[in-house]
Curated annotation (Swiss-Prot):
It comes from Lactococcus lactis subsp. lactis (strain IL1403). GO terms for biological process: negative regulation of DNA-templated transcription. Keywords: Cytoplasm, Disulfide bond, Redox-active center, Transcription, Transcription regulation. This is Global transcriptional regulator Spx 2. Global transcriptional regulator that plays a key role in stress response and exerts either positive or negative regulation of genes. Acts by interacting with the C-terminal domain of the alpha subunit of the RNA polymerase (RNAP). This interaction can enhance binding of RNAP to the promoter region of target genes and stimulate their transcription, or block interaction of RNAP with activator. GO terms for cellular component: cytoplasm. InterPro entries: Arsenate_reductase-like, Spx, Thioredoxin-like_sf, Tscrpt_reg_Spx/MgsR.
Length: 132
């Protein structure tokens, strides 16, 4: 089952939920602000994140700038603690299942959550349309 971590005012989160619903992909939603992640949950997400802490943090976020922390200069445990205490610094949405993780909304990349059969059918249709 897919879990999507969101924030109420996040436009990208709304787009991701709409996309998942449109494609009839069931998901559980968790509001990161109302129900912040534990340090254990953040660690589990980071294990799947190819870009490490930098892939999870929104560097343009005003809260990150206010903190004045250079995440490259601190330990992983310190970064996890800061993230757990300041969930608003995370990029959103965070979409994950048992195997995959995607941070942010990119319609092409989110397609990884479509079942393989659907991706193959849609790609075949796109190729056919481009050949015409």
């Amino acid at each position: 089952m897919i879990t999507i971590y969101t924030a109420p005012s996040c436009t990208s989160c709304k787009k991701a939920k709409t996309w998942l619903s449109y494609h009839h992909i069931p998901f559980n939603e968790r509001n990161l602000i109302a129900d912040p992640l534990s340090t254990t949950e953040i660690s589990q997400i980071l294990q799947k994140c190819d870009d490490g802490v930098e892939g999870l943090i929104s560097s343009r976020n005003r809260f990150v700038k206010t903190l004045g922390v250079d995440f490259e200069d601190i330990s992983l445990s310190q970064a996890i603690k800061i993230i757990s205490e300041n969930p608003q610094i995370m990029r959103r949405p965070i979409i994950m299942d048992e195997k995959r993780l995607h941070v942010g909304y990119n319609e092409e990349e989110i397609r990884a959550f479509l079942p393989r059969t659907v991706r193959v059918l849609e790609n075949g249709g796109a190729r056919l349309r481009s050949a015409i």
